[in-house]
Structure formats: C-alpha cells, structure tokens
C-alpha cells in the first residue's frame, strides 16, 4: 500500500527509490537551497529525498472530501486551506471557529494541533489550548455538517489537565492534554489519544457522540507511550504545572491509524523547535517520527524489536537527513491508492522557529516496508 509522507516547514514530496517516481509534472517547484553539510549526516539511502509543494502551514490535519483536500492547522481560530490535490494549488479559505475557543485557558485565539475526522455525517475538529512548556491544558471539539469554513459549533471542553473540572482525575493529574488524535473504528467506537512530555501519551474511549469520554477515565485510561528514564534534565520553573521534577520526556504528537491487520501508533520524539543553529542538540535528540503496532486500538503497541512503546520502545520511521531537519507532527490520510503519512520538518540549513508557516512534504512507498 502506498505510503505518502508529508513534512512541515515547506510542502515537499519524498520519494522512495524502489518505486516509480510520483509525478510532479505541471507543478512549479520552489528553488532548493544551496546544499551544505548536514549536522547529522545519514547514508543517502537511509530515508527518501524530498520535493516541495506550495503549502506553508504548521500542525495540519488533512482530509479528502469529494475531490477536494482540506487542511486544518494552527493559526487564528484554526486555519482551513483547500486544494484539488496534495500538490495544490492550496488556498486559505477561512477558519473553523468564528471566535476564540470557549475554553477559558491557554491560547484561545490560536488553538494548537487540530485533528479533523468525519463520522456519521458530521465533521469533528479536535483541538488543544495551552501555554508552551506548561500542562495547564485542555482539549476541545467543534462540529459541522460540512468540512469547509462556516457552520462550525464549538462544543468546548472534552478533557483537561492542570486546573479545572476533571483535572484531578487519573490520568489528567500527571498528563498534558494537548495533541489530540481521534480514531473511530469500523465498529463505531471512538478513542482519544493525547499527551506531550510529562507522563507520555495516553488514550481514553469516547462515547457515541465523540463529545464526551465514555465510562470512568481512571479505569479506562491506557498509557501507550512512555519511558521510565527521562533523557532530559528536570525543569526549574517556579510553577509546578510547568516543570517535570523527574526530568523531561520528549514524547508527543501521537496519531492512531489502521492498516490491515495492524493498528499503528505514530508519535514524535525529541526537540521540535527553538533551535540554535550554532548549538544544535546532539544527533538523535531533535524531532524524529517513530511508530509501534498492535492488533488492538487499545494497545499495547510494540516496535519491530518487540519493545513496548510504554516502556521506551519506538521504531524510527523518519529522521533528519539531507536538507530535512527534525521531522515530526505526523498524521495519516487513507486514500483508495494507499496511506499518506504527513508531517513537518525544518529545512536545513535555514533552521528557524516553527510557528505558523511550515512546509508540507510527502513520500511514497508501496508498503509499510520500515517493518521488514
């Protein structure tokens, strides 16, 4: 099955050498930067190379509806872009919310990391509000009968951590409720996967409406990704909601997908942004895309070596190479021709803060051959 991979910090197409090249005929390719030695060199065949398209966004979620692609991304009231193909041309057409999020915390004007799904004739856009480096966060949801701008209803709070109603319940007492990913199986059961740093990535079941958690969160919550030993030092922030006493665990950006007969849990590991080009993190400490798989959407998920993701496991799918630096923030779009894994990255040597503008990149493979 085709796997197309989209990266962030420019929209590019990444192509595996073992398959025919994806056609970019008729599309204008942006000028590539002058090649300079990569800080973390990889063998030429370690990862696919990239080609750029015309979409510049950050933290997108992409769906395909009746011949049109819709991208939802971080920005004022959650930006919407539309295009006739992944190549583009992409056009910004509006926003999901017609006002600030109704959740009274975090960055209400520009919610983070949205994910949009279609279920039972309704479009659901899940989003997060927070402040960088703190876990006083919340996940909300808006719904609409159409995927484009206009007609969305902000239902507000789904779950939250740090402060507020429900934040004193497990697992919200130790987790950070951002980076929502919702998966709905063929049986209609929905699952919310979320988390960033702190106690890692968690999952709770949703009720039939997808607007509330089903059952008791304390007993139904599953920790899916974690590492016992923190690779980064503890924060000294005076606010207890903004520090991790036992050290930082750079795990976030989960996404759950299904490729028969396996469920795949993708996540980002490492430093995502705010890079100092004169003092980059040691190789392997910057963002990379990792994955595990399971026969159940509830896990446990293991990597190719059989290591549980909840115990430090994770198969590296894509990492820094060529002009790609710190790829992550991934999601999966399922097409008739195959699966599309999209993500963001910084283009080397122009490594800069990822805020709103970033590049979208895609690569192509005939199978999930990273597991072979």
UniProtKB/Swiss-Prot annotation:
- Spans of biased composition, class Low complexity? 23-34
This chain is glycosylated at 120, 363
Q: Does the keyword Transmembrane apply?
A: no
Active site, UniProt feature: 59 (proton acceptor), 252 (proton donor)
Please tell me which top-level EC class this enzyme sits in: hydrolase
Q: Which GO terms describe its molecular function?
A: arabinan endo-1,5-alpha-L-arabinosidase activity
Task: Choose one Gene Ontology CC annotation of this protein and give it.
Answer: extracellular region
Q: Which InterPro entries match?
A: GH43_arabinanases (IPR050727), Glyco_hydro_43 (IPR006710), Glyco_hydro_43_endo_a_Ara-ase (IPR016840), Glyco_hydro_beta-prop_sf (IPR023296)
- Give the reaction(s) catalysed: Endohydrolysis of (1->5)-alpha-arabinofuranosidic linkages in (1->5)-arabinans
**What is the protein's major site of localization?**
secreted
What biological function has been recorded for the protein in this entry? Endo-1,5-alpha-L-arabinanase involved in degradation of pectin. Its preferred substrate is linear 1,5-alpha-L-arabinan.
Q: Which family does it belong to?
A: Belongs to the glycosyl hydrolase 43 family.
Q: What is this protein called in UniProt?
A: Probable arabinan endo-1,5-alpha-L-arabinosidase B
> Lineage of this protein's species?
Eukaryota, Fungi, Dikarya, Ascomycota, Pezizomycotina
State the encoding gene: abnB
């Amino acid at each position: 099955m085709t796997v197309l991979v989209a990266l962030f910090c420019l929209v590019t197409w990444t192509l595996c050498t073992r398959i025919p090249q994806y056609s970019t005929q008729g599309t204008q390719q942006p000028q590539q930067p002058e090649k300079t030695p990569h800080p973390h060199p990889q063998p030429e065949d370690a990862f696919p190379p990239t080609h750029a398209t015309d979409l510049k966004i950050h933290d997108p979620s992409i769906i395909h509806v009746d011949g049109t692609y819709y991208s939802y991304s971080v920005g004022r009231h959650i930006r919407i872009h539309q295009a006739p193909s992944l190549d583009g041309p992409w056009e910004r057409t509006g926003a999901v919310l017609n006002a600030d999020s109704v959740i009274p915390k975090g960055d209400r004007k520009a919610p983070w990391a949205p994910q949009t799904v279609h279920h039972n004739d309704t479009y659901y856009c899940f989003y997060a509000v927070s402040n960088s480096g703190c876990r006083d966060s919340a996940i909300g949801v808006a719904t609409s009968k159409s995927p484009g701008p206009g007609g969305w209803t902000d239902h507000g709070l789904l779950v939250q951590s740090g402060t507020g109603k429900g934040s004193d319940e497990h697992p919200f007492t130790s987790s950070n409720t951002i980076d929502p990913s919702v998966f709905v199986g063929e049986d209609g059961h929905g699952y919310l996967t979320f988390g960033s740093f702190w106690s890692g990535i968690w999952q709770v079941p949703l009720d039939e409406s997808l607007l509330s958690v089903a059952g008791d969160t304390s007993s139904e919550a599953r920790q899916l990704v974690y590492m016992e030993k923190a690779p980064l030092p503890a924060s000294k922030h005076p606010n207890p909601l903004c520090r991790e006493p036992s050290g930082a665990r750079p795990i976030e950006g989960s996404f759950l997908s299904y490729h028969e007969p396996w469920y795949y849990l993708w996540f980002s590991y490492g430093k995502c942004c705010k890079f100092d080009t004169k003092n980059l993190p040691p190789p392997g400490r910057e963002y990379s895309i990792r994955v595990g798989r399971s026969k159940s959407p509830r896990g446990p998920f293991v990597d190719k070596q059989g290591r549980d993701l909840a115990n430090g496991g994770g198969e590296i799918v894509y990492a820094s190479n060529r002009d790609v630096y710190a790829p992550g923030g991934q999601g999966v779009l399922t097409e008739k021709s195959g699966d599309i894994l999209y993500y963001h990255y910084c283009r080397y040597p122009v490594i800069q803060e990822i805020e709103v503008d970033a590049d979208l990149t895609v690569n192509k493979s005939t199978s999930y051959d990273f597991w072979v």
